[in-house]
């Protein structure tokens, strides 16, 4: 309540704080005195009423006896109340006195022995406390002048005169000497005359205040105000002294600041103390209470310094919010976010019930991801706690009305292809993918939501898991059922889950950020989500061809971390590929969701190692080369989205062949190891060749091919945040490895930095032979 006002400062602020606190204490004492006076008046009134019954005694002894007892009881109660008030008053004064002593000790480090002059000169001459006669105004000296001269005396004077005499026999002696000792002499006569008058009382007008009170060094107006405060208590007792005490003082001290005459509220807003009450008087001295409402009086003419900052600021800031209900606050915050992001209209999408609901929930997630509404919506599914809100569906709906609608409907190849090329449509496609996955089957919808939640929360569900969860893939959507089957295979899922738990967590981290990439055309592919791609149910009809393609696309982008590193904004090869093929279109629809992941990953330092998704996708391709997956997945080359588009078919073919032969082997071989190793290490290490099939791939395939694939893997990995890729990869690798993969080689070679090397060894030291790359 006594928050000081004025500009911040060290010593100055302390003085202001002390002054504000003293003023609050003074106001509290005045309030207590007023309460005591009113109580005394009541008692006197009750006593005055008592005589009238006496004359009525002849009236009737019994009648008189009853009223007398009542009056006596009332009088006794009043006397008890009065005694309590007096005790409270005494306790308050004692408390103030103790506070005064504590302040003087803590801030001034001054001995409180009243009989001897304080050894201010004997303090350590550290320069900070040094008291030189040269007039240096150190913090300690200024504080001493304020605190010792005025604070203690003022508080002492607040006590009864007799008590003040006992407590402080000599004001001049009690006060510590300070730099401006030249102003002290005025006090010495007071000390000599202490027997004649109370220490706090002021001499007659013969000794004007101005001679000694204005302390040129540091006191300021506080010094002028405090003398008046000193006399205030006595002034209330002796009205004649008030005039003398207030001489030369510009503040009407007998009138407390109006701000102290208002109800107080604790900062928690739970307790309210009405103005005229003992608790209010005590609360005035506590900074834990604020005025219930701002008042222009707050500043008060008497303390202009305090007014600007006084309780008013506290009132506005603390009382309002403090009293505001939690739910109301949350709603207001959400509304504010919605307005900031212009997403107040979740009805954009034709998602129906989910659209608006998710949109309402998505504003903050969208913000976090930095996505457009559609992108945010999609990632909302993965963002922790977002799914519950229905953020993904909503975001998608909000972001792109048309695409979102598609999202709920099975995605069709043409629609996706048309929308995918467009940046905006990509997010919508990704949203659609997400929604389509949800829509593919009610069960898959519910399941996918959990999976998304898992992603967002760090509990990543392997792609295979997701596939299992969403048993009803839009088989019509998949160009290659075999690929879908491989994706669905449960055994890889379980294996991948076991192996890649930690990588998944990392993936989750990345997955939370990928939203940003959706906005970019490349982003559509960039965030291949194992869940979407791997979940046939999630793939829309348009996606059918992309089933494998998405996996391949993921692999290609994810292969080279350097690629993703080079392209902070993931170049979405899948998007480029999607325009070429109808399944690619669907893949793009799939990729937009993945693109979101890619973008987040790209921001995070795109994963530099092949993600498990990439590896698993390759393994799948190898295992299902016979199935008509469409053109080999394009390797995401540094060329970017456009180049990737041109290459996709070739790259995919190449990838297929490679994945069928060596890549698949490595994916299968490394699946168990890499899921844990690569995802974790991918963050730190970046190398164009690092992900190239981990060296084996490079050797098995042409350098260029390996590099391209590595770049693709890098993009996919970076975009997917390696998290989704890892999940999908572990699951997929076992599946694809079963049919076409050669037995897992006992030795897997990886080009890695020392840090990565350590991480790999920590997981499977004997299984991997690591080549350190400078």
UniProtKB/Swiss-Prot annotation:
Entry GO terms, CC: cytoplasm
Pfam families per record: Dapper
Biased segments, Polar residues type: 438-452
Signal peptide positions (record): none
Source organism, top-level taxon: Eukaryota
Stretches the record annotates as Disordered: 188-225, 295-319, 345-500, 624-710
Keywords: Coiled coil
Any one GO molecular function term: protein kinase A binding
Biased composition, class Basic and acidic residues, residue ranges: 655-672, 686-700
Compositionally biased region (Low complexity): 637-648
Motif PDZ-binding: where in chain: 771-774
Coiled-coil residues: 67-93
InterPro entries attached to this UniProt entry: Dapper
Function: Involved in regulation of intracellular signaling pathways during development. Negatively regulates the Nodal signaling pathway, possibly by promoting the lysosomal degradation of Nodal receptors, such as TGFBR1. May be involved in control of the morphogenetic behavior of kidney ureteric bud cells by keeping cells epithelial and restraining their mesenchymal character. May play an inhibitory role in the re-epithelialization of skin wounds by attenuating TGF-beta signaling.
Subunit architecture: Can form homodimers and heterodimers with DACT1 or DACT3. Interacts with CSNK1D, PKA catalytic subunit, PKC-type kinase, CSNK2B, DVL1, DVL2, DVL3, VANGL1, VANGL2, TGFBR1, CTNNB1, CTNND2, CTNND1, LEF1, TCF7, TCF7L1 and HDAC1.
UniProt-listed PANTHER family: DAPPER HOMOLOG 2 (PTHR15919:SF13), DAPPER-RELATED (PTHR15919)
UniProt record similarity statement: Belongs to the dapper family.
Protein name: Dapper homolog 2
Natural source organism: Homo sapiens
């Amino acid at each position: 309540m006594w928050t000081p006002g004025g500009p911040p400062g060290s010593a100055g602020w302390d003085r202001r704080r002390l002054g504000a606190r003293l003023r609050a204490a003074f106001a509290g004492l005045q309030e207590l005195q007023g309460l005591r006076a009113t109580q005394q008046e009541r008692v006197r009134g009750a006593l005055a009423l008592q005589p009238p019954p006496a004359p009525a005694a002849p009236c009737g002894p019994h009648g008189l006896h009853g009223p007398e007892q009542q009056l006596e009881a009332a009088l006794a109660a009043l006397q008890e109340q009065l005694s309590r008030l007096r005790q409270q008053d005494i306790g308050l004064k004692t408390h103030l006195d103790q506070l005064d002593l504590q302040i003087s000790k803590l801030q001034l480090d001054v001995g409180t022995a009243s009989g001897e002059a304080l050894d201010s000169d004997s303090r350590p001459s550290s320069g900070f406390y040094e008291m030189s006669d040269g007039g240096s105004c150190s913090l300690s000296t200024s504080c001493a002048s304020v605190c010792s001269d005025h604070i203690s005396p003022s508080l002492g004077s607040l006590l009864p005169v007799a008590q003040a005499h006992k407590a402080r026999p000599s004001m001049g002696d009690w006060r510590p000497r300070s730099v401006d000792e030249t102003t002290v002499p005025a006090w010495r006569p007071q000390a000599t005359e202490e027997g004649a008058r109370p220490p706090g009382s002021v001499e007659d007008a013969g000794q004007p205040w101005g001679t000694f009170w204005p302390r040129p060094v540091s006191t300021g107006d506080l010094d002028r105000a405090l003398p008046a405060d000193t006399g205030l208590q006595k002034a209330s007792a002796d009205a004649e002294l008030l005039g003398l005490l207030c001489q030369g003082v510009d503040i009407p001290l007998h009138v407390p600041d109006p701000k102290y005459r208002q109800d107080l509220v604790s900062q928690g807003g739970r307790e309210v103390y009405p103005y005229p009450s003992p608790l209010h008087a005590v609360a005035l001295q506590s900074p834990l209470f604020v005025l219930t409402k701002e008042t222009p009086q707050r500043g008060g003419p008497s303390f202009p310094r305090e007014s600007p900052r006084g309780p008013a600021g506290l009132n506005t800031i603390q009382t309002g919010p403090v009293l505001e209900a939690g739910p109301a606050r949350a709603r207001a915050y959400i509304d504010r976010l919605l307005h900031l992001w212009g997403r107040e209209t979740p009805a954009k999408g034709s998602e129906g019930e989910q659209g608006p609901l998710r949109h309402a929930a998505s504003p903050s997630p969208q913000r976090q991801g930095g996505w457009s509404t559609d992108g945010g919506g999609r990632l909302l599914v993965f963002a922790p706690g977002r799914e519950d809100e229905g953020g993904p569906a909503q975001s998608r709906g909000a972001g792109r009305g048309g695409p979102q609608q598609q999202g709920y409907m099975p995605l069709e190849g043409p629609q996706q292809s048309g929308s995918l090329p467009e940046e905006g449509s990509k997010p919508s496609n990704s949203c659609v993918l997400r929604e389509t996955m949800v829509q593919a089957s009610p069960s898959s919808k519910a399941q996918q939501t959990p999976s998304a939640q898992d992603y967002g929360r760090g509990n990543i569900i392997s792609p295979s898991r997701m596939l299992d969860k969403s048993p009803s893939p839009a088989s019509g959507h998949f160009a290659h059922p075999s690929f879908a089957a491989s994706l669905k295979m449960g055994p890889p899922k379980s294996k991948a889950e076991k192996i890649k738990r930690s990588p998944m967590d990392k993936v989750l981290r990345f997955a939370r950020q990928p939203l940003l990439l959706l906005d970019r055309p490349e982003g559509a592919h960039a965030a291949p989500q194992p869940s979407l791609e791997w979940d046939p149910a999630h793939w829309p009809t348009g996606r059918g061809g992309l089933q494998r393609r998405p996996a391949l696309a993921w692999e290609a982008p994810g292969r080279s971390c350097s690629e993703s590193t080079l392209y902070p904004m993931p170049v979405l090869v899948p998007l480029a590929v999607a325009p070429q093929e109808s399944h690619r279109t669907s893949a793009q629809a799939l990729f937009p969701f993945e693109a979101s992941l890619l973008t987040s990953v790209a921001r995070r330092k795109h994963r530099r190692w092949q993600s498990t998704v990439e590896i698993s996708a390759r393994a799948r391709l190898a295992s299902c080369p016979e199935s008509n997956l469409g053109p080999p997945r394009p390797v995401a080359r540094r060329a970017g989205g456009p180049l990737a588009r041109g290459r996709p078919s070739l790259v995919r073919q190449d990838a297929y062949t490679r994945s069928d032969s060596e890549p698949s082997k490595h994916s299968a071989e490394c699946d168990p190891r890499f899921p844990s190793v690569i995802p974790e290490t991918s963050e730190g290490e970046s190398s164009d060749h690092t992900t190239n099939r981990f060296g084996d791939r490079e050797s098995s395939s042409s350098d260029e091919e390996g590099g391209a694939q590595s770049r693709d893997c890098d993009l996919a990995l970076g975009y997917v945040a390696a998290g989704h890729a890892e999940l999908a990869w572990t699951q997929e690798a076992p599946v694809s490895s079963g049919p076409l993969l050669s037995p897992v080689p006992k030795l897997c070679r990886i080009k890695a930095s020392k840090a990565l090397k350590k991480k790999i060894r920590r997981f499977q030291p004997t299984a991997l032979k690591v080549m350190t790359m400078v």
